[in-house]
Amino acid sequence: MDADIFQNLRLELRRGCLILAVLAHLKTEQYGYTLRKALADLGLAIDESTLYPLLRRLESQGLLVSEWREQDKRNKRFYRLSRDGAETLQQLEAEWQGLNASMNRIL
């Protein structure tokens, strides 16, 4: 298989997983750096150039809320799930469980 084809398919597969992982991890409020580090520590590394546009998009869709706060003498933007985000996360978690079970049977 062509390496470019594999890379494109791999990125497509990861995209949906990243959305679910970010939403799940923002059940508790975090700022971008701590979110990125936590996901990496759990085995899901994500580039800043991917994370921050994703956070902005999820916020514009009403799934996240954010606010600027000073911490350690620096301004940081903290993110958390909105009410709609929490409902969407529940739906996506259920969808993930079904897909995961199906894929485990298929593979």
Question: What are the residue ranges of the model-derived segments?
Answer:
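Short, charged/polar surface micro-motifs in flexible loops or helix N-caps
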Residues: T28-Y31, S60-Q61, G85
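Basic, amphipathic "hinge/linker" alpha-helix immediately C-terminal to the N-terminal HTH DNA-binding motif
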Residues: N75-E93
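N-terminal helix-turn-helix DNA-binding core of bacterial DNA-binding proteins
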Residues: R10-T50
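Beta-hairpin "wing" of winged helix-turn-helix
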Residues: Q61-R74, R80
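Short, hydrophobic-biased segments on the C-terminal half of alpha helices
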Residues: Y52-R57
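Alpha-helical residues within the helix-turn-helix
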Residues: K37, E59-S60
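Short, Lys/Arg-enriched N-terminal segment that forms or immediately precedes the first helix
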Residues: M1-L11
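Amphipathic alpha-helical dimerization/coiled-coil segments
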Residues: Q90-L107
